[in-house]
């Protein structure tokens, strides 16, 4: 890795249909083997399902991401032969990335017909503060709380 210049983050363009960067990030997160059109179809299918249930899909999606974004996490840190789980605050970009990753992961684990259906159900659950994604966030917060004593090892 070169030490000369700082790497500039690329700006993700907004999604053409909903004009939202967050939706485009989710499409990229769902995509497998470069099949973006399939991922787009899954997302839009999930949004259509949410709309059929009488709710605004973009609002539900944004609420689901907001509810499942962690504020703190633990990172392993070696100090004198012992490894401590040190609680660290999560930067906003990383928090959103983790939330999207968890939403996709727990959607894939659900039993159901199509991925669009499973994603719609997971998004609805996360928006209502239930489901596996929210449980994962709570678990992460509990781990950080339990290891609060090691917060002075922060780096």
Swiss-Prot record:
Record key words, sorted: Ribonucleoprotein, Ribosomal protein, RNA-binding, rRNA-binding, tRNA-binding
One of the record's GO cellular component terms: small ribosomal subunit
Keyword Ribonucleoprotein: yes
Any one GO BP annotation for this protein: translation
Record-level Gene Ontology MF annotations: rRNA binding; structural constituent of ribosome; tRNA binding
SUPFAM superfamilies linked to this entry: Ribosomal protein S7
Function: One of the primary rRNA binding proteins, it binds directly to 16S rRNA where it nucleates assembly of the head domain of the 30S subunit. Is located at the subunit interface close to the decoding center, probably blocks exit of the E-site tRNA.
Subunit structure: Part of the 30S ribosomal subunit. Contacts proteins S9 and S11.
Matches recorded under HAMAP family: Ribosomal_uS7_B
Name of the protein in its database record: Small ribosomal subunit protein uS7
